[in-house]
Amino acid sequence: MAHLLLHGTLEATILEADHLSNPTRATGAAPGIFRKFVEGFEDSLGLGKGATRLYATIDLGRARVGRTRVVDDEPVNPRWYEVFHIYCAHFAADVVFSVKAAQPIGATLIGRAYLPVRELLSGEAIERRLDILDAGRRRISHGPTIHVRLQFRDVAGDRHGWGRGVSGARYPGVPYTFFSQRPGCRVTLYQDAHVPDAFAPRIPLAGGGYYRQGRCWEDVFDAISNAKHLIYLTGWSVYTEITLIRDGTRQRPGGDATLGELLKRKASEGVRVLLLVWDDRTSVESLGMKWGFMSTHDAETADYFRGTDVRCVLCPRNPDAGRSAIMGAQIAYMITHHQKTVIVDHDMPVPRGGGSRRIVSFVGGLDLCDGRYDTQFHSLFRTLDTAHHSDFHQPNLDGAAVTKGGPREPWHDIHSKIEGPAAWDVLYNFEQRWRKQGGDKDLLLDLKAMADLIIPPSPVMFPDDGEAWSVQLFRSIDGGACFGFPSTPEAAARSGLVSGKNNTIDRSIQDAYIHAIRRAKNFIYIENQYFLGSSFAWKADGIRPEDIEALHLIPREISLKIVNKIEAGERFAVYVVLPMWPEGPPASGSVQAILDWQRRTMEMMYYDIAVALEAKRINADPRDYLTFFCLGNREVKLNGEYEPAGRPLDGTDYAKAQKARRFMIYVHSKMMIVDDEYIIVGSANINQRSMDGGRDSEIAMGAFQPCHLNTKGLVARGQIHGFRMSLWYEHLGMLHDNFLNPESLECVQRVNKMADKYWDLYASDELNDDLPGHLLTYPVRVTKEGTVTELPGAKFFPDTQAPVIGTKGNLPPFLTT
């Protein structure tokens, strides 16, 4: 049967199944009353197999898109009555409903039912009892059925969403989410941990002003220093020995204090200081030192604060109670808490009598730990005797140390500060997590009782203020990490949550990306640490795509958006900035596996584009529509530069990179800008770990300025536009009028040409000057058929023997996707 595209939203309800039999049990086909008696007897005495535990799933092609809770006591006629709101971008012949019996390890298939996709394309609601068939699609005796209700809404028919952008100030935000959109906020956007005075591009904004860059770690230092009641932090890593203020021209009183000293001082002043730090369960103690596979310093941080007024809780990523034993172990040892937030009380923007305070929150990609401090210059060698002498970070090169010299690994990241009602949502996320895993719940301040000191959630800007923001908070998290999730699927659905096999998930970050991509008009600009997913659409090239389970939709949504624009004869461009390779030795098994997934993702997208171009008989380079970049730096040696006492071993990658004086700039950003009017910033990578909801815990915000939209003949020229232009100035070393229209062919070809040139300079055997810009073409070749291969003569990353396009590995995809 032909596979048809379902691109839109599928509203599905699984009501019940009837006349089921279980082939794995001797009583599996006995009358229902007898089966319930036998199974109940076994269950109560702990004998035999106990009660049959049934659940149902929904599949589209090679992707599982829905799963009910487990029903324990109805072996014949289980009733679920569960509703699913499913974003879909899948080719499939049928919607497949499977009924399964849960086991301690795995599950037993009872049977499957099929509804042809072609019946959904009209958009009419369908309610039907479908025959449940065996694995060979044969009828089963007793005639079991499953009762379902379905309605599909194609994106092309969504007149109020598809391609509409942020359609106006009343745009309500992403639907079906736990947190609503909050108007009347203020947002500050940050590129990197610090911006020196020397980085000052003049970027015009609407109204005649110019864009002003924020300074993240300065603002975090000030916020912590000025807090009077509370400081709440979450982090993948929090390292007590870093200093936040390192720019000698912008010192502050107490700026030489370490983060640990600063937090202890505030706690001693009576401020409630609570930390939730991910507990890396690989951490061990050896020879008096504490080590962990991920080098997060979690045990050191906990020891540092032990016995002080700071309460630091090491927080393991516990699985939701509904997980199987195997899945629970995978989550506990392979999955992380990845949220990065700082929440403080802060003075009012306009002083009020009585010393009233408000809540301010920081959200983004920057952990308060070592290796994160950097500026837009991303030096490899020139800060080794100043800002990075005590903070030398280079995990990609074995044996690297400041005593042996650079290159250090530069760090590019994006963060945000939220003021107004949405800042309280970040606080509420912390409180939910603390109540689940923080221990003493009484340590959380009762802010309702402190309303005379800290005002309740309220706007900090009037809606008609030209600089006001509307902000919505999104998460990836489940009931294993978050207190207070509804216990029933019905209540979970009303709260914008997804219920599964006895677990409840918030995966609104993925929903936010999908929603923003679908509404995009002209262009998308992405910076992210990873870019892989939509594995259901990968080619079966040495793998079984259905085994990979990197099912999130973001790459496929992007390629289908581009295809739609090609078919409509309209321009659209997508720019994606990635690290050259994931952090770690580039030839290692984990890095190579991720690069392989990344290449498969790129190839899936470029194949979609190539097919669309061929169908329209357009002779164009696929990179005119979708183009990938990485960041790198290369520096000539200056007089007076830091001279290390030692040197790396000859012939190593370290020695080669030091001699060539080059290295990648590590892209750790997690950001998407759409049409210069909407932005998502957070901790979530574009991979399954971050977008799943049941794997790494994440947090992000989506925001826009109602007075700076592409509406009523105007072009968005607010803070988001200024931020993108500032990022492009950082990466390209210049500004150009073409950059004002990123969707234009002139712009994308100019940027590609500059990045090609910068890559050639980066990869060259000669070095005469510093690189004029950091944006490098990602070193792959894209054919007109959409195939992705290495560049001619560039099989390996410079100074390594690590293949650019990766190699298939043996590590579990659950870990590397």
From Swiss-Prot:
Paired cysteines (S-S): none
GO CC annotations, alphabetized: plasma membrane
Annotated ranges, domain PLD phosphodiesterase: 333-372, 663-690
Biological processes, Gene Ontology terms: phosphatidylcholine metabolic process; phospholipid catabolic process
Keywords, alphabetical: Calcium, Hydrolase, Lipid degradation, Lipid metabolism, Metal-binding, Repeat
SMART domains noted in UniProt: C2, PLDc
Cofactor(s) annotated in UniProt: Ca(2+)
One function term, GO molecular function aspect: phospholipase D activity
Domain C2: 1-130
Active-site residues, record numbering mapped to chain: H338, K340, D345, H668, K670, D675
Free-text comment about domains: C2 domain is a calcium-binding fold, and the binding promotes the protein association with membranes. A lower affinity toward calcium can be anticipated for PLD alpha due to the absence of two potential calcium ligands.
Function: Hydrolyzes glycerol-phospholipids at the terminal phosphodiesteric bond. Plays an important role in various cellular processes.
Name of the protein in its database record: Phospholipase D alpha 2
Source organism: Oryza sativa subsp. japonica
